[in-house]
Amino acid sequence: MSDAPIATSSEVTQSPADYDPTKKQKSAEKTARIPIKIVPAEKLKKPDWIRVKAATGNSRFYEIKDILRANNLVTVCEEASCPNIGECFGKGTATFMIMGDKCTRRCPFCDVGHGRPDPLDVNEPGNLARTIAQLKLNYVVITSVDRDDLRDGGAQHYVDCISQTRELSPNTRIEVLVPDFRGRLDRALDILQACPPDVMNHNMETVPRLYKQARPGADYAHSLKLLQDFKRRNPNVPTKSGLMVGLGETDEEILDVMRDMRAHDIDMLTIGQYLAPSNHHLPVTRYVHPDTFKMFEEEAYKMGFTHAAVGAMVRSSYHADQQAHQAGFA
């Protein structure tokens, strides 16, 4: 057992009478009902290497937002409060989040809202396909909330989005960042077999020791199995996964996860610095130095990853097109 500190959240109380499962819960409301051990921690000062590019006045930032709203679409960029939103929207790129904006999980590192999801929007695949065509995107990332309420975890909705996007934009490469389909993995993979993406991504997020705190409802071995089983069914489709640092892990634990990834045939890797969305989320326990990120990158290539995007501001879908291109997949 490692002696590294465990990231914890501040305590918020919520009575059963206050809980409304149909309401989208964010921040304190979302994390209030998770039994997280509370350890007072001083908020760390951000180092100089943590820098975010803001949207500029002549960027496409507001144009992209208007197009998304007009088509009733959601991006994880907005819902998860991604620090790179200004840069990505400014370049006319976005990671689309399908199946609503209410997740059935309550991961306390994530800023996506929790609640009882709405019924699937049958028009969403068409709206998404038309938006991608309108934006003339060469590479898109499609992700989603967890939908534990659906028998297939939302796999058929992914297939509908992929197939309709390919009908209108046959030259567009499609990466999906999927949930874990826990409890329905074989059914989900059977469905995805009908129309697999160009890149299959599922994030491990953190080291196994921290799963109980950071990913309640998820299972480390299951996430590895998802990617390996998909790869066995689709050997020509690259697989990808991502990790955060700063939740209480050690460098050696990160390297161990990377080894597990390669042992499960994962091709591409992303590692970035965790930044707490609010005081009600898991706190940052450390800011990893650029030299350490460089070490992770060098070790990744030694292990045989085809591409490793590693750095403080790296996120799973940040510059995903460039990641795939550099890996030789796009």
Curated annotation (Swiss-Prot):
Residues 88-306 form the Radical SAM core domain. Residues 7-16 have a biased composition (Polar residues). Binds 2 [4Fe-4S] clusters per subunit. One cluster is coordinated with 3 cysteines and an exchangeable S-adenosyl-L-methionine. Its cofactor is [4Fe-4S] cluster. [4Fe-4S] cluster 1 binds at residues 77, 82, 88, 317. It comes from Cupriavidus metallidurans (strain ATCC 43123 / DSM 2839 / NBRC 102507 / CH34). The keyword Lipoprotein does not apply. This is Lipoyl synthase. GO terms for molecular function: 4 iron, 4 sulfur cluster binding; lipoate synthase activity; metal ion binding. It catalyses: [[Fe-S] cluster scaffold protein carrying a second [4Fe-4S](2+) cluster] + N(6)-octanoyl-L-lysyl-[protein] + 2 oxidized [2Fe-2S]-[ferredoxin] + 2 S-adenosyl-L-methionine + 4 H(+) = [[Fe-S] cluster scaffold protein] + N(6)-[(R)-dihydrolipoyl]-L-lysyl-[protein] + 4 Fe(3+) + 2 hydrogen sulfide + 2 5'-deoxyadenosine + 2 L-methionine + 2 reduced [2Fe-2S]-[ferredoxin].
